[in-house]
């Protein structure tokens, strides 16, 4: 069991600005080789309860992944590899106390993981019932398992699988 305090909050309009603040810092270092900087994950879906952590996918050409890693390392991000998920490179960070807590990934533009993130986000944005069901499962999971991230994830997984089935996507 990984012990990690789980906090899920009602949607906060501030998360949009938190994303923009982080994005602005990323744009400065990545310049024009970042094809897009996408706000993904639950904080990107208006009205959805979420852990207050901004998920960000930096989209680059496959040939620019190494360049993006080096640029991000130059401003304090720590490359962690793909953490077992093909199609993305994950980053931790130090010295970013001025920014909202966030998870940062670099994804090649044709990555299946990027497509999955965007499709899930867009589906929840356009399907109120799915958004409500998912949000409720997250709130309930956090209430039941406030100190166990693995149980939290396990509890909400059937709802995620149901959403992927409705989207006709395979859930890993």
Model segments located where?
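Active-site nucleotide-donor binding segment shared across nucleotidyl transfer reactions
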Residues: 26-67
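Short amphipathic alpha-helices in soluble, non-transmembrane regions
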Residues: 68-76
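Conserved catalytic core of two-metal-ion nucleotidyltransferases
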Residues: 77-112
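Short glycine-aromatic motifs
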Residues: 34, 76-77
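Short, conserved, surface-exposed binding loops centered on an aromatic residue
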Residues: 46-48, 70, 93-97
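Catalytic cores of NTP-dependent nucleotidyl/adenyl transfer enzymes across multiple folds
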Residues: 114-172
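Short histidine-centered catalytic/ligand-binding loop motif
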Residues: 6-13, 57, 120-124
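Helical scaffold of the NTase/Pol beta-like nucleotidyltransferase catalytic core
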Residues: 1-38, 161, 172
